[in-house]
Amino acid sequence: MVRMNVLADALKCINNAEKRGKRQVLLRPCSKVIIKFLTVMMKHGYIGEFEIVDDHRSGKIVVNLTGRLNKCGVISPRFDVPINDIEKWTNNLLPSRQFGYVVLTTSGGIMDHEEARRKHLGGKILGFFF
């Protein structure tokens, strides 16, 4: 079976494993977008370290969970978000201003909404986590 949205599958696996109280989760297939998204999550401490396993096919990622993640999801379709509309999207997606991040793909790479605002970049919205 062909997977339509690998990022959505990966985030749903992380969500389900976190709800079940697992310490680790195995994601496959591996992609650059998933790795960058996980890097943003790890930078903010929502997940632990992750390891990329090369199985000579599409690859696997083993993610260590910390129990801090409440929810993560993907936004499909990937809407264009200018800099002025980032605030509107964060209000819609996140429960509060104090925590949670919206992940954007910009011309400067994949980053959270705060970094995009600092660098004055708009882009396409990938997903969120809190």
Swiss-Prot record:
- Taxonomically, the superkingdom here is Eukaryota
Keywords, in A-Z order:
Ribonucleoprotein, Ribosomal protein
Any Gene Ontology biological process: cytoplasmic translation
**Molecular functions per Gene Ontology:** structural constituent of ribosome
UniProt cross-references to InterPro entries, sorted A to Z: Ribosomal_uS8, Ribosomal_uS8_CS, Ribosomal_uS8_sf
One short Pfam name that applies is Ribosomal_S8
| GO CC, alphabetical | cytosolic ribosome; cytosolic small ribosomal subunit
List the Gene3D superfamilies hit by this protein, alphabetically: 3.30.1370.30, 3.30.1490.10
Q: Which family does the similarity line name? A: Belongs to the universal ribosomal protein uS8 family.
Xref: PANTHER family? 40S RIBOSOMAL PROTEIN S15A (PTHR11758)
Q: What is this protein called?
A: Small ribosomal subunit protein uS8A
Organism for this UniProt entry:
Drosophila melanogaster
